[in-house]
Amino acid sequence: MERRDNRFAKGVLTGILCSLAVAAAATWGIYFLLTTRQKAALPQEEQAAGLDYGEIEEKLEKLKTMVDASYLYDVDEESMRDGIYKGFIASLGDPYTVYYTEEEYKELQESSSGEYVGVGVQISQDPSTNLITVIRVFRGSGAEEAGLLAGDVLYKVDDEDITTEDINNVVAKIRGDEGTTVKLEVYRESSGGFVALDVERRSVSMDTVEWKMLENGIGYLQITEFDGVTYSQFTEALTDLKSQGMKGLLLDLRDNPGGRLDQVVEITDDFLTEGVIVSTKDKNGQGSTYEADEELAFDGPVSVLVNGNSASASEILAGALKDYGRAKIVGTTTFGKGIVQNIYPLGDGTAMKVTVSDYYTPNGTSIHKIGIDPDVAVEKSEEEDGTDNQLEKAKEVLLEELS
């Protein structure tokens, strides 16, 4: 598998992969979500250094005068203002350092909490066809009750054709107040026709953890991202699998782009009794160290499935378990995002996400732009019978540990 396939890159950086009523423009990775009291603050001398803001203001006034005098179309002053701020941050050349408008920041907060008001689906947009497809339907959602299915292709929202629209605009059309409904028309390949559904908007918890028992005492647990509800869902899953007699755990982190640091630290801690989980270091050599406590949630053998789209927080979990020999890593080399972002509210409803530090695995290794190599390398192959060859290899590795 290509380590950074086009679909994944678009999902991580521009929000091609998004959940309805969450931030379509949110960039993933690993980050601290700070409270509104923790606003961005820089020393005065740093604010003034390097840039002549008087000259910049003068230049902007000239540009604005020229636009007002000559530009053919109407000007959205708010969009122009936001564009200035976004361009300023984008000039850093770091795709993970981002300015959020008030609306984007509100959506980001909903996204990172894992709870929001919406129809309860995750969608993706094909950049070549512009078609938007449902890829997940969350449990207990209005979408599930209405009968929306993964694989459905979205064509209309409230009788309005959306096949030429950007995914962000479509998300905005589907969003609404709790208890209200939206009419969605989808094409369903299995039935070869269009289906119209009235879907209620509800308070929804995103399903970031899925699990089931496999044969031979193997429990399967997939984490799709790390947000505010992930650890509680992970605990529920692990408890249920153990109650069913799980002897070995197959942990699937494939295509997991990352998320919140606090959540992945909690999960990693459940597999370790001591030692460093991850450490960080900023440009001044300062940082934090996160360590495991003595409590152990599962002491059986573990296989971890990863691929080139397993990034950031996923790599913290896989890296720690690998460094301590706590699990066998199976699959392909991970994405290689070894940096941490802080999100700073700016006091006016907007916010900025800034890359602030590198992170290191327990052995002191930086995996940034390198990734984590698996213990057992297995490229994904397309089997005619639909067999997941990577999953089968991980099961084989786990059975060897259990024997």
Q: For the regions a protein language model found, what residue spans apply to each?
A:
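Intrinsically disordered, Ser/Thr/Pro/Gly-rich linkers and terminal tails that flank
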Residues: 1-125, 149, 156-157, 162, ...
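Cleft-lining beta-strand/loop regions that shape enzyme active-site pockets
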Residues: 2-4, 135, 144-149, 158, ...
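Short, structured beta-strand/loop micro-motifs enriched in basic residues and often containing a Trp
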Residues: 132-138
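Conserved P-loop NTPase
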Residues: 341-345, 352-384
